[in-house]
From Swiss-Prot:
GO terms for molecular function: 5S rRNA binding; structural constituent of ribosome. The lineage of its organism: Bacteria, Pseudomonadati, Pseudomonadota, Gammaproteobacteria, Enterobacterales. CDD domains: Ribosomal_L18_L5e (cd00432). One of its GO terms (cellular component) is cytosolic large ribosomal subunit. InterPro entries: Ribosomal_uL18_bac-type (IPR004389), Ribosomal_uL18_bac/euk (IPR005484). This is one of the proteins that bind and probably mediate the attachment of the 5S RNA into the large ribosomal subunit, where it forms part of the central protuberance. The gene is rplR. Keywords: Ribonucleoprotein, Ribosomal protein, RNA-binding, rRNA-binding. This is Large ribosomal subunit protein uL18. Gene3D superfamilies: 3.30.420.100. Part of the 50S ribosomal subunit; part of the 5S rRNA/L5/L18/L25 subcomplex. Contacts the 5S and 23S rRNAs. GO terms for biological process: translation. Belongs to the universal ribosomal protein uL18 family.
Length: 117
C-alpha cells in the first residue's frame, strides 16, 4: 500500500463515521502548491461553501500559496463565508492528512474566525 492509498483509506473511514453522525463537514484537501476547503452538507450531496488558494482574491494577498500563511488565509475565508450562510458548527474532515502544519493552520484560523468544531 502506497502513501496515497493509505491516506484515502484513513479518509474513507473517518468520513463514514462523520456520515453516521449526520454532521456538516469542513473538508480539507492539500497539494504541494495549493490548499482547498469546503463545507459540505450532512447528506454529502451539496457543497455549501468553498475557499482555496486558487481563487484570485485570496492568492493576490499572499506571497506564496503552498505555506501556512496561505492555509490560515483560506481558513479565515471559509469561516467568514460559512458564518454568512448561518453555519456555525462543523465537523473537521482532514481527509486522512496529518493534523500538522498547513492543515492545523487552516483549522486554527477557522476557529479564530468563529467556526466551531
Amino acid at each position: 500500500m502506497d502513501k496515497k492509498a493509505a491516506r484515502i483509506r484513513r479518509a474513507t473511514r473517518a468520513r463514514r463515521k462523520l456520515q453516521e453522525l449526520g454532521a456538516t463537514r469542513l473538508v480539507v484537501h492539500r497539494t504541494p502548491r495549493h490548499i482547498y476547503a469546503q463545507v459540505i452538507a450532512p447528506n454529502g450531496s451539496e457543497v455549501l461553501v468553498a475557499a482555496s488558494t486558487v481563487e484570485k482574491a485570496i492568492a493576490e494577498q499572499l506571497k506564496g500559496t503552498g505555506n501556512k500563511d496561505a492555509a490560515a488565509a483560506v481558513g479565515k475565508t471559509i469561516a467568514v463565508r460559512a458564518l454568512e450562510k448561518g453555519i456555525k458548527d462543523v465537523s473537521f474532515d482532514r481527509s486522512g492528512f496529518q493534523y500538522h502544519g498547513r492543515v492545523q493552520a487552516l483549522a486554527d484560523a477557522a476557529r479564530e474566525a468563529g467556526l466551531q468544531f
